[in-house]
């Protein structure tokens, strides 16, 4: 086995494998191990299932260690093939379904692609999410100030503090119309809240970042530039944080948080509804 890898982990599904990945990652994060992840979506027929089984078995014979397999598969004949592999297999959905079945005294009716597939019941929600993504892309980095009143949240911050990835995550994961507005170096001599944003202050949310981290990120983009200098980063961060305090704009430091954590904190602080898809 590669010395840098403790375990190989498979996420397998007859659908997108998103559920298997999310739950599997959550479980594996509890253990101090380095993993090599393999995601295999749309395992929908026996031929594909046998190929997956062979892949699992090959890693076992190569390393001598059982791969960990998190799977979500509806058809029993497909599940049976995966279960015959040399992997340590965990049915992530059935582990929750069985006790719920007993509690609710109802038999489940498994349907492939129900979790992330389109159907007449969720088509409107899907269309709303696509509209949110379109809106967010059109209002990224201050590209357009038109229709800002339609935003559910407007993220503020210096360049490279995480505004764009957070906005896109909010749109894609939760269907939130998220605009973002950058404060650039030229703004810093007299930093004030732009007139176009003042009527929308209840929608504003600020991001900040440790200057050292900001300098490192900017250095990768513009090496040895004033833009990436620690002095410049310290000045910009200090000015922006002062603006947040003066205008009573809620804000968080993004340095030690993932995009998922930042987005969730924004939803919580701003009281925005979580719309899962």
Swiss-Prot record:
InterPro entries: Kinase-pyrophosphorylase, PSRP
Reaction catalysis annotation: [pyruvate, water dikinase] + ADP = [pyruvate, water dikinase]-phosphate + AMP + H(+); [pyruvate, water dikinase]-phosphate + phosphate + H(+) = [pyruvate, water dikinase] + diphosphate
GO molecular function: ADP binding; ATP binding; phosphotransferase activity, phosphate group as acceptor; protein serine/threonine kinase activity
Pfam family of the protein (one): Kinase-PPPase
EC class: transferase
Keywords: Kinase, Nucleotide-binding, Serine/threonine-protein kinase, Transferase
Binding site residues for ADP: 157-164
EC number(s) stated in the UniProt entry for this protein: 2.7.11.33, 2.7.4.28
HAMAP family to which the protein is assigned, alphabetical: PSRP
Family, similarity comment: Belongs to the pyruvate, phosphate/water dikinase regulatory protein family. PSRP subfamily.
Xref: PANTHER family: PYRUVATE, PHOSPHATE DIKINASE REGULATORY PROTEIN 1, CHLOROPLASTIC
Function recorded in the entry: Bifunctional serine/threonine kinase and phosphorylase involved in the regulation of the phosphoenolpyruvate synthase (PEPS) by catalyzing its phosphorylation/dephosphorylation.
Protein's recorded name: Phosphoenolpyruvate synthase regulatory protein
Organism annotation: Escherichia coli O6:K15:H31 (strain 536 / UPEC)
Gene: ppsR
């Amino acid at each position: 086995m590669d010395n840098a890898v403790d375990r190989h982990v498979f996420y397998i599904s007859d659908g997108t494998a998103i559920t298997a990945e999310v739950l599997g990652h959550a479980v594996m994060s509890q253990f101090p191990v380095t993993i090599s992840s393999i995601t295999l979506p749309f395992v929908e027929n026996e031929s594909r299932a046998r190929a997956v089984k062979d892949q699992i078995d090959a890693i076992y014979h190569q390393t001598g260690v059982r791969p960990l397999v998190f799977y979500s598969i509806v058809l029993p004949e497909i599940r049976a093939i995966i279960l015959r592999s040399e992997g340590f297999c965990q049915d992530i959905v059935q582990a929750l379904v069985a006790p719920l079945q007993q509690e609710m005294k109802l038999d489940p009716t498994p349907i492939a692609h129900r979790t992330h597939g389109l159907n007449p019941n969720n088509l409107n929600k899907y269309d709303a999410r696509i509209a949110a993504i379109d809106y967010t892309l059109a209002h990224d980095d201050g590209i357009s100030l038109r229709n800002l009143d339609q935003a559910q949240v407007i993220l503020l911050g210096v360049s490279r503090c995480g505004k764009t990835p957070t906005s896109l995550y909010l749109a894609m994961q939760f269907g939130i119309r998220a605009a973002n507005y950058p404060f650039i170096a030229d703004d810093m001599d007299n930093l004030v809240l732009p007139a176009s944003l003042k009527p929308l202050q209840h929608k504003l949310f600020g991001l900040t970042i440790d200057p050292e981290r900001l300098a490192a990120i900017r250095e990768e983009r513009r090496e040895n530039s004033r833009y990436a200098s620690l002095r410049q980063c310290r000045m910009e961060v200090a000015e922006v944080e002062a603006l947040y305090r003066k205008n009573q704009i809620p804000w968080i430091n993004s340095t030690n948080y993932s995009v998922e954590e930042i987005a969730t904190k924004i939803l919580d602080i701003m009281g925005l509804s979580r719309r899962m898809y």
